[in-house]
């Protein structure tokens, strides 16, 4: 009995254990534990691909169509145009994102880029085999190639892909210069001129997909073979089937898909891999769709139909057609389902019934009826409507209305009476002036710039050449530490901001603008200062400082960071290589920047330079500079669009780059090659430019205008004539580096200051002392400053303590290497000409200044009657006297003049003799010790002394000497001749 009880107990215990074990194995608790383990294993084994989200967003933002035309008479001109446009569009997107294109099956036009050329068709035999290494700097670009490559292997590389491909939304139809049909899920594509291809279509109609990749490399392949032979692969497959998780497995690459419409049935597809994992770790097919080919065929016993559903703006549309037939029909999916339901419910179905139900023509209804008779299940693939290509935005101009009763805040002060009876004016701080600032400096220039802009395909190519020329090797740049930036920002306000924001990393990108406090020759739209968040500026400065020292200061045309002496040397060096020099003046430069210049040139340069480790951060910082919300000090909101934010770390260098690019592009438009155009850029400092005269004025202006800028040619100076750069006049840069500060602009404002805090006498001493450093030998300026200091109490000043002093004395290196000067009597002629006087009148006044002793308030003033034309209607107010108020004149095209230089520039072009030839300057025609009253101005002066005749400058046709323009034209002609010569 006891034995029986023991056996019973043992059997009961075993049964209990079995039942308990079974319940545990099938319990939700164990399932949760297994799933949790699986998730942890996946988290440990998956790999996130770097910068995927940023790359995808950048591609979406930068996708902008570039139109490329082909020659007339091309056998399939429209198709080739769209194809070439797509290729240039994709290349442009890649380079604007800071990456380099890797082109699979490039055409001869793309031979300069890295890529792979293999043989997929007969046309490929025109080129040689090549296979460059793919790096993490590349984005793969394909044009009508994805049909022939293993997309699973390509996506598995983990490199972003841009491809132009055929994505039909119907089962047959017309395409540009041809038509297509579908048989056995293969598209048969026929184009005029003989192109006839068959291939399958990849299904990109999911936003997130995956691919499986086979092992790559010798050892990985060998390991896989050994696992297959030993049965490990089969065992892992069994475990995966039973448990949903197993060792090993193929690599799975997950990626996002975006599509952009190029034309009918034609899309640009963006593929950005973002993670990898192993297939045996999860039931991957339950997570999403695997990249596969499109399936159009609907098999049945009667006839093989093709079907595809297209999601349009009006709703889903289904396309039906017999395999291989050109005839097809497309109708709303809902209508087709209703027709099919009616067909199935009706006992007798005739073609006439389908015609009536579908409300289609007999021809289209016949296709629908045939499909219904075949009894197709119609499990059609779905094709999604792609996104449209990005477009430019148009800025809306703000209107402003000056309130006569408004009393603006005055800030400018005089520390002495003006050297001239005419003085500069200052805009008061008021709401009406802020509205005028937005209209005249931002919204208006942006609207006019967009109306002028005309970007051609060649300009995209030239922009890429310029970027690569400035940054030959990509990905070498790294930012400086933020501590480096703080050490170089030594102004009191900068130090205070650094201290306050040192522990704050996050910020909201809002532009806070204010009206700049500065003097104008005549009433003008006040300049706008757009400040950006401190963190944005400091972080971006860490890149701009590094880029400036690594790249910019080593190129010959870049003048910032150079001392005045070095700049003067550069002007003289440029003159030595030129027979003519051209001065350029941009109007409202900051307000006329458009997206092409910012993204295709400026941003592309920084992105190409920076290392991939920092590309994401830099791209974000650069993106913040465009279309940021902005508000003025008095609360007026506005849209800066793509204009330059003047308080940004990019301002000086970005403006210099843009200025240089305009000069470079003009050279390319004139027929120069890359190196030649680069050599003839000239010199630039922000919006100030000076270049050789080998490009015509019309071409320079037209080139700038096509980019949106408003460029005026101020002076085309032949050898021996005065030239102005950075508001300094060089009497003859071909023979001397000496220069003087622009007399008119300086003398109108010399006696004023915008400093509202410092002692007025301290400011006066500091300002005059600063001008005596840079222009002690300049007639009138030097005389006036010495007269002021002679008649007031001497002071010891530190230039760093004052803001309203010349820029060129704020740096000790600049002071030690100041502008070269000379005591030539010819400078009297220059100053007199600038002020509209005779030399005798000027010398008389200078003698009065030298002899004056008395209170500063009694300093002699020179009477002038210059035409200082207002640029806007104003109510004159403030302590500083202003010019008259009048309506702005209009140009020939009816637009208001927009130049910032209010005073007329006198005789910046060469004088002419009776035959209309350019004449040399005074010094070569004058006897020693004699002065010429007519220095640069050909107009009649108040002096009764008649002008002396001058020998003409020999033109190209009258001597053996050729101008720079002749050399360029000759070089271009020789180049064309070489191209025409047989090899």
Swiss-Prot record:
PROSITE patterns linked: RDRP_SSRNA_POS (PS50507)
Low complexity bias: start-end ranges: 943-960
Upper taxonomic lineage: Viruses, Riboviria, Orthornavirae, Kitrinoviricota, Magsaviricetes
UniProtKB keywords: Nucleotide-binding, Nucleotidyltransferase, RNA-directed RNA polymerase, Transferase, Viral RNA replication
Any one biological process term the GO annotation gives: DNA-templated transcription
Catalytic reaction annotation: RNA(n) + a ribonucleoside 5'-triphosphate = RNA(n+1) + diphosphate
Boundaries of every RdRp catalytic domain copy: 579-701
Role description: RNA-dependent RNA polymerase which replicates the viral genome composed of 2 RNA segments, RNA1 and RNA2.
Bias type Polar residues, positions: 883-899
InterPro entries per UniProt: DNA/RNA_pol_sf (IPR043502), Noda_Vmethyltr_dom (IPR043647), RNA-dir_pol_C (IPR001205), RNA-dir_pol_PSvirus (IPR007094)
EC number in record: 2.7.7.48
Organism: Striped jack nervous necrosis virus (SjNNV)
Domain of life: Viruses
GO molecular function: nucleotide binding; RNA binding; RNA-directed RNA polymerase activity
Composition bias type Basic and acidic residues, residue spans: 914-937
Name the record gives this protein: RNA-directed RNA polymerase
Matches recorded under Pfam families: Noda_Vmethyltr, RdRP_1
Annotated segments matching region Disordered: 879-983
């Amino acid at each position: 009995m006891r034995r029986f009880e023991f056996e019973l107990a043992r059997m009961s215990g075993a049964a209990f254990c079995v039942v308990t074990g079974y319940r545990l194995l099938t319990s939700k608790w164990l399932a949760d534990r297994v799933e949790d383990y699986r998730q942890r294993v996946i988290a440990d084994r998956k790999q996130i691909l770097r910068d995927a989200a940023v790359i995808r967003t950048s591609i979406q933002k930068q996708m902008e169509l570039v139109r490329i035309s082909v020659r007339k008479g091309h056998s399939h001109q429209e198709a080739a145009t769209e194809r070439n446009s797509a290729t240039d569009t994709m290349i442009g997107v890649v380079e604007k994102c800071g990456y380099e294109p890797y082109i699979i099956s490039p055409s001869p036009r793309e031979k300069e880029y890295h890529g792979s050329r293999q043989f997929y068709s007969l046309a490929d035999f025109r080129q040689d085999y090549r296979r460059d290494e793919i790096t993490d700097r590349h984005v793969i670009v394909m044009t009508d190639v994805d049909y022939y490559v293993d997309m699973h292997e390509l996506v598995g590389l983990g490199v972003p892909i841009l491809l132009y491909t055929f994505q039909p939304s119907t089962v047959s139809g017309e395409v540009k210069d041809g038509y297509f049909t579908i048989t056995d899920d293969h598209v048969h594509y026929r184009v005029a001129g003989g192109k006839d291809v068959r291939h399958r279509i990849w299904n990109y109609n999911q936003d997130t997909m995956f691919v499986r990749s086979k092992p790559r490399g010798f050892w990985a392949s060998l390991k896989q073979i050994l696992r297959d032979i030993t049965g490990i692969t089969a065992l892992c497959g069994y475990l995966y089937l039973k448990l949903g998780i197993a060792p090993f497995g193929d690599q799975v690459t997950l990626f996002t898909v975006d599509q952009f419409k190029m034309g009918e049935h034609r899309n640009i597809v963006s593929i950005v891999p973002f993670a990898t994992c192993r297939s045996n770790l999860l039931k991957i097919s339950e997570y999403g769709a695997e990249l596969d080919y499109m399936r159009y065929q609907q098999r049945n016993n009667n006839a093989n139909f093709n079907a595809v559903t297209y999601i349009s703006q009006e709703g889903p549309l289904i396309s039906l057609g017999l395999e291989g037939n050109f005839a097809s029909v497309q109708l709303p999916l809902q209508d087709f389902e209703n027709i099919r339901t009616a067909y199935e419910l009706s006992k007798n179905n005739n073609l006439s019934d389908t015609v009536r139900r579908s409300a289609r023509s007999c021809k289209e209804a016949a296709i629908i009826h045939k499909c219904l008779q075949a009894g197709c299940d119609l499990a059609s693939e779905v094709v999604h409507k792609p996104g449209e290509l990005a477009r430019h935005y148009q800025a809306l101009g703000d209107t402003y209305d000056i309130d006569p009763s408004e009393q603006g805040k005055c800030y400018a002060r005089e520390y002495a009476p003006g050297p001239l009876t005419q003085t500069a004016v200052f805009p008061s701080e008021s709401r009406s002036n802020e509205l005028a600032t937005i209209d005249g400096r931002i919204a208006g220039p942006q609207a006019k710039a967009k109306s002028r802009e005309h970007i051609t395909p060649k300009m995209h190519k030239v922009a890429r050449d310029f970027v690569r020329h400035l940054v030959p090797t990509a990905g070498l740049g790294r930012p400086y530490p933020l501590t480096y930036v703080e050490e170089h920002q030594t102004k009191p306000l900068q130090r205070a901001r650094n201290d306050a924001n040192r522990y704050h990393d996050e910020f909201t990108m809002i532009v806070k603008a204010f009206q700049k406090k500065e003097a104008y020759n005549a009433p003008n739209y006040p300049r706008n200062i757009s400040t950006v968040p401190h963190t944005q500026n400091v972080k971006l400065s860490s890149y701009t400082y590094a880029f400036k020292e690594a790249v910019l200061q080593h190129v010959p045309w870049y003048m910032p960071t150079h001392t005045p002496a070095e700049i003067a040397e550069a002007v003289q060096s440029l003159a030595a290589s030129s027979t003519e020099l051209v001065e350029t003046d941009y109007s409202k430069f900051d307000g006329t920047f458009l997206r092409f210049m910012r993204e295709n040139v400026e941003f592309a340069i920084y992105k190409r330079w920076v290392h991939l480790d920092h590309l994401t951060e830099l791209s974000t910082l650069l993106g913040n500079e465009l279309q940021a919300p902005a508000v003025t000090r008095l609360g007026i909101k506005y849209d800066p669009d793509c204009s330059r934010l003047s308080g940004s770390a990019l301002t000086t260098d970005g403006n210099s780059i843009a200025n240089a690019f305009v000069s470079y592009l003009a050279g390319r438009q004139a027929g120069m090659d890359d190196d030649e155009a680069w050599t003839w850029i000239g010199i630039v400092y922000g919006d100030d430019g000076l270049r050789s005269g080998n490009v015509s004025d019309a071409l320079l202006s037209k080139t700038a205008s096509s980019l949106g800028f408003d460029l005026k040619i101020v002076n085309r100076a032949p050898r021996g004539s005065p030239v102005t750069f950075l508001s300094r006049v060089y009497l003859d840069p071909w023979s001397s580096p000496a220069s003087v500060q622009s007399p008119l602009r300086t003398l109108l404002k010399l006696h004023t200051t915008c400093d509202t805090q410092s002692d007025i006498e301290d400011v006066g001493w500091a300002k005059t002392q600063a001008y005596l450093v840079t222009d002690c030998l300049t007639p009138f300026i030097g005389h006036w400053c010495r007269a002021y200091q002679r008649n007031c109490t001497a002071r010891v000043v530190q230039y760093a303590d004052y803001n309203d002093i010349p820029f060129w004395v704020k740096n000790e290196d600049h002071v030690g290497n100041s502008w070269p000067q000379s005591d030539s009597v010819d400078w009297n002629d220059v100053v007199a000409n600038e002020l509209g006087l005779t030399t005798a009148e000027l010398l008389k006044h200078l003698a009065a200044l030298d002899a004056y002793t008395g209170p500063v308030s009694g300093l002699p003033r020179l009477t002038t009657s210059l035409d200082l034309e207002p640029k806007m209607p104003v109510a004159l107010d403030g302590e500083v006297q202003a010019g008259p108020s009048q309506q702005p004149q209009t140009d020939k095209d009816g637009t208001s003049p927009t130049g910032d230089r209010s005073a007329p520039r006198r005789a910046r072009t060469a004088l002419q003799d009776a035959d209309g030839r350019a004449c040399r300057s005074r010094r070569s025609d004058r006897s020693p010790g004699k002065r010429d009253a007519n220095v640069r101005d050909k107009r009649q002066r108040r002096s009764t002394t008649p002008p002396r005749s001058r020998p003409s400058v020999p033109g190209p046709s009258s001597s053996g000497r050729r101008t720079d323009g002749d050399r360029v034209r000759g070089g271009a002609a020789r180049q064309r001749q070489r191209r025409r010569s047989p090899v």
